A protein has these predicted regions:
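C-terminal nucleotide
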Residues: 2-12, 16-18, 25-27, 33-78, ...
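Stable alpha-helical structural segments in soluble proteins, enriched in small hydrophobic residues
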Residues: 98-110
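Gly/Ser-rich catalytic serine loop of serine hydrolases
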Residues: 86-98
Length: 307
């Protein structure tokens, strides 16, 4: 039986980790996927199977990398193998990451497993393998999404070459504060959004804002979340939400600009990008989730973590 691989949420670090900020990524068990061979092929399984065939050809180009048994992979593909997944594509919750993790898990001959002592070297090795594998899906990948899905534990990124598995404060089921996902109702695409960011990074003003403000507040958010300092977390999330609103407009779907600003002005909720933006989910932080739910009653809200 194939293992299940979960979605992920990058709580903090979108765009920042490209420029060496801290980041914090957590598994999200609400969505999941597994490799399967269908009894009778469907439209869905055929589409997935054809993507996996292309993916297999990509893996042949980098085959020295992960010691993958591509002959077995191809045999299964000819039997109709597909990735049966509930993870929405283009939503910033790691649909391609889970697929990459599943393929590595099933076909790597000498895989690094969750059960062994995960040294920093092993984590970086996995991340490198995953980054090359996932580049098939969106050009440039940090390897973090598959890593998160594969290990299914929170990951703290301290810098590009310093990643650790981490514990996060346990949830308070009766807490009034919460992290939630807001459904934008449209899909986003990673590659064009990252290109816009890279283009903007060529301007001195934007670069300066990233290093002096964006990264600073991202790092403070990670620190205050992990230490359980909720007051500081909301203060920094508010600053981050404002910086994103002022400098990352193309990544925020047009019809959410007003809503984004309303949250900052009222203090009821603070929105931020979930992954690369441009659609998919928008991440929200609310000091009082009931009030936020009321203010956002026309939207689909999914609470993912209670403070």
């Amino acid at each position: 039986k194939s293992s299940l691989f979960f979605a992920k949420i990058l709580l903090f670090g979108e765009y920042g980790i490209i420029e060496d900020s801290k980041g914090l990524s957590i598994p999200y068990n609400f969505f999941k996927g597994a490799l399967k061979i269908p009894e009778t092929p469907s439209e869905k399984s055929k589409n997935s199977n054809s993507i996996l065939f292309d993916f297999c050809n990509h893996l042949k180009q980098i085959k020295g990398l992960a010691d993958l048994d591509l002959i077995l992979f191809e045999k299964h593909l000819n039997e109709g193998l597909y990735f049966d997944s509930s993870i929405p594509k283009g939503y910033g919750v790691g649909s391609s990451g889970a697929l990459v993790a599943a393929v590595y898990d099933k076909y790597s001959n000498n895989k690094i497993t969750v059960l062994e002592n995960l040294t920093r070297e092993k984590l970086l090795k996995l991340k490198t393998i995953f980054s090359k594998m996932e580049s098939f899906f969106h050009g440039k990948s940090s390897g973090l999404d598959p890593l998160n899905s594969y290990l299914s534990i929170p990951i703290l990124i301290k810098s590009k070459n310093d990643i650790n598995v981490t514990g996060i404060p346990s949830q308070k089921s009766n807490g009034s504060g919460a992290v939630f996902l807001l459904d934008s109702g449209q899909t986003g695409s990673t590659a064009p959004m990252v290109s816009i960011f890279m283009e903007k990074m060529k301007s001195d003003g934007f670069r300066k804002m990233i290093s002096s403000q964006f990264i600073k507040h991202t790092n403070s958010c990670v620190d205050s979340f992990l230490s359980g300092d909720i007051k500081s977390l909301f203060a920094n999330t508010k600053k981050l939400s404002k910086i994103v609103f002022e400098n990352f407009k193309p990544m925020i779907p047009d019809e959410f600009h007003q809503l984004w600003k309303k949250g900052i002005d009222s203090g009821s909720y603070f929105l931020k990008l979930c992954g690369s933006g441009g659609g998919g989910y928008i991440l929200g932080f609310a000091p009082d989730i009931e009030k936020a739910k009321n203010d956002l009653k026309d939207y689909n809200l999914e609470v993912v973590y209670h403070f």
